[in-house]
Amino acid sequence: NQFRGIVRQAYDYSCGSAALTTLLNGYVGTQLSEQQTMNGLLKFGETEKIIERRSFSLLDMKRFVGALGLESGGYKGEFSDLVTQAQPAIVPISYAGFKHFVVFKAYKNGRVYVADPALGNISFDEQRFKDIWENNTLFLINVAPEHRKKFLALQDSDLRHVEDATVNRYAFVDLQYPQFYMDKIADKASTIRLDKNLNEESENFGKPTYNFLRLYYKSK
C-alpha cells in the first residue's frame, strides 16, 4: 500500500499537521486524526503568528507535542546525524519548485525512504535527498525505547515500490514538467489557510477563519 502508515493529506489540511500526525501515530502510538493535530497546533502554538505567516512552525509542533506530555525539538545536523539517530523525523524538503514536510523513515543501500503525506511512501537516492533537504533541519520526538512503535519501519513493500515506480513519476528530478501536470501535483495536496475574518457584516468579524488554497508554494 503506497500510503501504509501515513496519515494521508486529504480534506485540504496542511502538510505540517499531516506529517506530525504520521510521526505521532507511527512512532509514539497515538491515534490522532489530522484535524485533531491541527486543532492542537492552533491551541498550543503561537496562534497570532500562525495566522500571520499562514503556516505552522517547528515551535508550534514542539508546544503541541509538549502538551501531549512528550519532549521534542527541532535540530540542525549532517546527513550522517539523520541516519545514525535511527528514528523517524520530520524533515523539510524542497523539490520541483515547491517546499514540503515529509517524515524520514530510513536509509538503506544508498536510498532515503520517506513518508510523504501527499504522495505516499517514496524514496530518493542519497545525493538527491541531500540536495533538497532544507537547511539540514529535522524535528525529533523523544520516546523511551520500550514505548517506541514501529509502524514507520521499512518493509519489503517499500523496497519494491521504488522499482515499480520511478522518481520521475513524482516530479522529483530536474525536468521541466508541463504546467498542467504541476497543477495536478499541487492540487493533490491542497490545504487551508488561517486568516482573520475581515467581513464587517459577518458575526465572526475579527475571528480566525479558514480559506482554501494549495499546500505547495513556489519557492521562486
What are these regions (language model features)?
Residues 1-47, 178, 187-206, 217-219:
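Active-site nucleophile-adjacent alpha helix/oxyanion-hole segment immediately C-terminal to the catalytic cysteine
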Residues 41-142, 147-151, 217:
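Conserved active-site-adjacent core of cysteine acyl-enzyme catalytic domains
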Residues 107-220:
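Noncatalytic regulatory segments and standalone regulatory/sensor domains
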